[in-house]
Design a protein with these regions (language model features):
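A conserved segment at the C-terminal end of the G1
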Residues: 22-28
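Short beta-strand-centered segment that lines the nucleotide-binding/catalytic pocket of NTP-utilizing
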Residues: 32-42
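Pre-Walker A (Motif I) flank of P-loop NTPase domains
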Residues: 3-7
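C-terminal accessory "lid"/substrate-recognition subdomains
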Residues: 144-174, 190
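Glycine-rich phosphate-binding P-loop
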Residues: 9-22
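Conserved phosphate-donor/acceptor-positioning beta-strand/loop module used by diverse small-molecule
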Residues: 110-131, 148
Length: 190
C-alpha cells in the first residue's frame, strides 16, 4: 500500500511560510499541523502545553532547561523533541497532511512520499510582512531586523542540534520557495 503524501514546511520567520502552509492544506483539503503538535504532544505526555511551547526552539544544552530538569534523566527539550517526532510520525501514517516546522523534514527522512520544503524571503520583505501582522508592534526596521534574526537563530540552533544538518541548507529540502513580491504580484494586488 502506498504511503500518504506528506508535505513538510520549514521557514524563515516572517517569510510567509505559515500562510503558504495553510493555503496548501486548504487547496489540497488536508490537515495542517502546527501548534496542534503542541496539544497532541501534551495529551500523550502529561506535560503542559505551556511547558512544551516554552521548550520549542530550545536545545537541551540550555542552562535554563538544565536547571529546570535537575534530577531528571532527560532534559525537557529532548523529551519534547522525541514526543513531537512521534506525533509527527503517527500523523503522517494516518493520512496526507502538512507539517509546519519542528524538524518535520528530518523526522520523516526515511519515509517515502514526503515533499520537504523551505520558505525564505529577503530581509526587507520579511520586515514588511512582520509589520503588517495585526499583532505587530510599532518599532523601527532595525529592531525588526534584530527580532527576525533572533527567531531565525533559535530555529537554526534547534534544527542543527537535533538533526545534525544545517537549517535552510538547500540539500535538506526538495523544494525551496522564495516569497519576495514580484512586479506581477504587485500588479495583481492593485
Amino acid at each position: 500500500m502506498k504511503e500518504p503524501m506528506v508535505i513538510t514546511m520549514a521557514r524563515e520567520y516572517a517569510s510567509g511560510g505559515s500562510e503558504i502552509a495553510q493555503a496548501v492544506a486548504d487547496k489540497l483539503g488536508i490537515p495542517l499541523y502546527n501548534k496542534e503538535l503542541i496539544t497532541l504532544a501534551a495529551k500523550k505526555s502529561g506535560l503542559t502545553e505551556e511547558a512544551i511551547a516554552a521548550s520549542e526552539n530550545q536545545r537541551s544544552g540550555s542552562l535554563i532547561y538544565s536547571l529546570y530538569m535537575m534530577g531528571n534523566t532527560m532534559p525537557l527539550a529532548d523529551q519534547v523533541y522525541i514526543l513531537q517526532s512521534n506525533v509527527i510520525k503517527e500523523l503522517a501514517a494516518e493520512g496526507p497532511c502538512v507539517i509546519l516546522g519542528r524538524c518535520g523534514d528530518y523526522v520523516l527522512r526515511e519515509r517515502p512520499n514526503v515533499l520537504r520544503t523551505f520558505v525564505y524571503a529577503p530581509l526587507k520583505t520579511r520586515i514588511q510582512f512582520a509589520k503588517s501582522r495585526p499583532d505587530a508592534k510599532d518599532m523601527p526596521d532595525r529592531l525588526w531586523e534584530t527580532q527576525l534574526a533572533k527567531h531565525d537563530r533559535a530555529r537554526a540552533s534547534y534544527y542543527n542540534y537535533y538533526t545534525e544538518n544545517r537549517w535552510g541548507e538547500a540539500k535538506n529540502y526538495d523544494c525551496l520557495l522564495y516569497t519576495s513580491p514580484s512586479p506581477r504580484d504587485t500588479e495583481r494586488s492593485r
